[in-house]
Each structure stands twice: as structure tokens, then as C-alpha cells.
Amino acid sequence: MSQQSHVHGVAGLKKHDIKVSGIVFMLYCLVGAGAFGIEEMIPESGPGMTLILLTVFPVVWAYPISNLTAECGSLMPSEGGVYVWVKEAFGEFWGFQAGWWGTVSTYITNGVYVTLVTGYVSQLIPMSEISLHVLRIGMVLIFTVINLFGIKEVGKVSTVLSVLIVLAFALVSIVGFMNWNTSPVEPMMPEGYNLLDSIGNGICICVWMYCGYECISNMAGEVKNPQVIPKGLMIAMPIVALTYILPTIAGLATLPSGSWMDWATDGGFGNETVGYATVLTQNLGNIWGYIFLLVAIVSQCAIFNTYMASGSRGFFVLADDNLCPRFMVRISRKRGVPYVGIISLAIVTLLLSQSDFTTLVSIEVVFILDLYIILSIAVIKLRKTVPVDERKKRGLYVMPGGKLGLIFFTSCPILISAVALLVNGTDYLMTGLIGTVTGPLVYIVFKRKYGGLSVDEPGRYPVNTSTKLAFGDIFRIGIFIFLLGSVTFIGQFWLRWYEIDYGGWTSSDYDMMGEFIPQILVIFKWAGLCFIAAGICIMAYGYKKDRPSSEEIVDYDYFIEKYSVNK
């Protein structure tokens, strides 16, 4: 085959026959891969509140996001997931923002899992700094090779790792329930905490523990029958929830009264803290602490494996739409996988796995919450683009509950994301908002340099020759700046009350810039006002000089056929 005949981009991807079970286990790895992380909630929120949050969040957070993903994925089972859905709803500017937020967040955090693995391994085997570097490189290389084989192999590895993790936490549940010792819900909250304190301390961790369902959609273009993804979502969600709730109840019930204050992510691994491993070491012997430490390593490997598969497709799809450097669109001849995206993610992971993650993760948190907000709004718009009746005629998945269901499924992620943004801390919000500004800046550069959607469909996506952007982009940028200013200005009132007047936070309560928080809040106030004013001016100018083109009447058959797996 000649170089010219080799197809790159989404059209050249190899499709795999992935069963529902494969999707379920990949989702399990993307979202949970065990209950590790919940340990930090227990002393911060209290045993009772932790269990309430773990039980409520599947209903008000995981179930809505799963349904949003299932409905959009059924309508548009395309590589790129949320990016494609937002692009079809609101155009390439907002689509790029969604793609940028989702992809950059994966590039930022994938190194966390490598660092956690090396930390766990060093508890088993004392290692020098050089040995740790070798271990990091070895881990990244192994899962890079697996990903280069394709998502079918990723799914097989995910299945094996998921089964091991589920069995381990099932054992924790069984042993804990058989050795019930105390009430798992007492106390409801830590002493001196009220309801707001308790919920505020746990909500961000709970959001983190139940996020990731949308990531599977990034690989939909490589699944022969992508309609298995909505089915997998509905099965994976309760499995994840049970893997969190049951072991946590069992652990709190079997460990001594008062030990809930000592829970930590490294608990039970030969130190003074406790955790899920302690349930086994206390009742079955110390050897089980080492066995469970291996499970913790497996868990982080499982997450890393699936996030490498999902995250490596982000820039690949943007490049296919001429919104990213074109070399990212290349795929391998034999396997039909986006090898440049996989290798680039591996390189960035190695570099960042040796860094301090505090600032990077603070940016990632805001990116993910922004992504859920815009996904919810896009679903509302797409309901108008392709009505429910048209979808049902074609046997596509539609969220239950009619209009009330739509309100529930879209409002819950928006409200919870907004709350999580404002209780995570001024330091995290500031770095996250600064990171968010990179989206429009990078879009302007890439759109002007590579042409965007107008390269392949100039009639549908015309370019304004004076700005070299899409018609209406100036107006959209104005909206972005206005929203950024509104969040900043309104948020500072809440943060000033929640953290200072009510909470009495000191500089030690912040992970970053604690001594500068009063000054940052002043900056929020005036910068927010400036951004609001600038956004209004830019919107007014854009509406007058760069008005968005009117929406076309949708040809439902063409729209659905465009993303049909059988096209």
C-alpha cells in the first residue's frame, strides 16, 4: 500500500467487535477501579455523611451523567465523544473548548497514577530514586504497548484487572460484614462540624470518585456496534456504586469505634492509619495487607491503562477537524490506532510523573467540571436539533422521564459542578480559571493556522476573512469572557463568606497561596467586573460586525447518517 493510499484520521480507524462486558469493565476502570480515595472522605465528612454522599451521588451525579453520555452516544456514536456532541450543538468554538478541557485534563492527571503505583511499590520493596525512575518508565512502556495494539486489547486487560479489583473489595465486604463490631454511621459528622462543613469537605472527593463515564465515548468510533456503550453505562454505574458503598460500610462496621478518624489512602499497609486493607489484616492476618497493596497497584494500573486509551483520542479528533497540528491525526497501518496520540500522552506522562501535581490537578478539576456543565447544556440543545420522536423511530436511546427527566438529568450535573467549583477553595478556583483561559487562546491560534472545520466543509462552516475565525466566534468569545467574569465576581462573595467569615480558614487550610487569599479575592472582584464589561462590549461588537450565521433546518436522516456506524 502506498503512503498516499493509507488513510489517516477517524476514517482510518480500525473497528473492533467489543462486547457489552468489555465496555462495562473499561468503564469500571475509567470511573472507579476500586474504592481507593474514599478513605480521605471519612475523617473529613464523618462516617455517616460519607455513606450518605456515596449513596446519594449515584442518583444525582453518576446516573445523570451516564444518561447524558448514553443519549448523546446513541445519537452520535463518534470518536471524540463530548467534543463532537458540543460541536454539533454549538459550533466548533465551544466544541474545541470541550475537547480541550477533556483532553488536557487527561494529559495532566495520567502521571498521578504512575506516581501512586511507584509509591505503593516502594512500600513493598525499598527502592532508590533511580529504581523508581526505571519503574515509572517500565509501567508507561507496558501500557503504551497495550494501547498500541488497540482498544480490544485495552478491554481485555481492563477485564482481567477489574475482576481482580472487584474480588478484592468483595472480600473486604464479606469479611467486614461477618465481623460486624460497631455502627458504621456514627458519628454522622466530625465533632464541631455542621451540615455545610461535612458536605463541603466530602463533595469534591465524591464528584471525583463518580466521574469518568463520558470518557468511554472518546473511543466510540473504534467500536463496531457503538450502541453497546449505552448498555454498558447502565450496567457499570451500579457496579461502581456497590464497589464503593459495601466495602465502606463493612470497613466502618468492623474496625474499632473511633478508628474512623484514622482512615487514609495508605491505611492498612504497615502504618498507624487504617483503610480497606485493615479489614483483612485485622481479621485474616498481616499477609493480607501485602496482598491488598498489590490490589492497590493493580487499581492504579487499570485506571492508567484506560485513561491512556481515552485521552489519546482527544487531540487526534481535533486534528482530524483541522483544529490541532496535523501530525496528531496519523494512525498505524496494521492496527489502525492513533499512535501519535498514544505516544505523546506517554511522553507527557513520564515528564509530569516526576512533578508536583497540586497546581496541575487544581486546573484539571475546573476543566472537568466545566466539561460536565457544557455537556448538560449541549444535551438540551440537541433535543431541539433532533427531537425525541425522530430518535425513537430509529431505535436510539433516549433518557427516561420526558421533559421532567431532561430537567433532572441536566440540572443535577450543572448544580453540583457549580457547588464543587465554589467549595474546592479559592486557590483551586483561581488556578483553574487561569487554565480555562487557555482554551480560547489556543483555539484562535489553531483555527487561524489550520483552518478548522471550514477546510473540509467551507459551505457549512464559512470563515470570516477579516478575523480568519468562524462567523460568530467574536460573539462566542465575548460570551466566554462574560461568563468567566461572572463566575469570578459572584464567586468572590461566596468564597469570602464560606472560607473567611463563616469557615475561619487560615493560610494552612489552603494547598497553594494561602497567605495571599485576601488579595486574590480582591483581584477576583475587580477582574470579574472588568471581564464582565469586556465580555459585554465584545458580544455587542461581535453581534454587529460578526453575527453568527442563522441555523439551518436540520435534515434528520442526514444528521443521523453522518454518525451512523454503517455508513
PLM feature spans:
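Loop-to-transmembrane helix boundary motifs in multi-pass membrane proteins
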Residues: 15-23, 92, 133-137, 224-226, ...
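Transmembrane helix-boundary motif of multi-pass solute transporters/channels
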Residues: 17-119, 207, 213-216, 493-511, ...
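TM-loop-TM module centered on a large, flexible mid-protein loop between adjacent transmembrane helices
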Residues: 84, 91, 122-127, 232-305, ...
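C-terminal membrane-solvent junction of multi-pass transporters and transport-like membrane proteins
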Residues: 157, 193, 331-335, 372-429, ...
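Membrane-interface "cap" regions at the ends of multi-pass membrane proteins
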Residues: 1-70, 74-80, 89, 187, ...
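Hydrophobic transmembrane alpha-helices that form the core helical bundles
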Residues: 41-44, 63-140, 144-148, 153, ...
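Membrane-interface loop-to-helix entry segments
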Residues: 118, 132-182, 193, 233-237, ...
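Hydrophobic alpha-helical segments and their helix-loop junctions in multi-pass secondary transporters
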Residues: 124, 163-190, 248-258, 372-390, ...
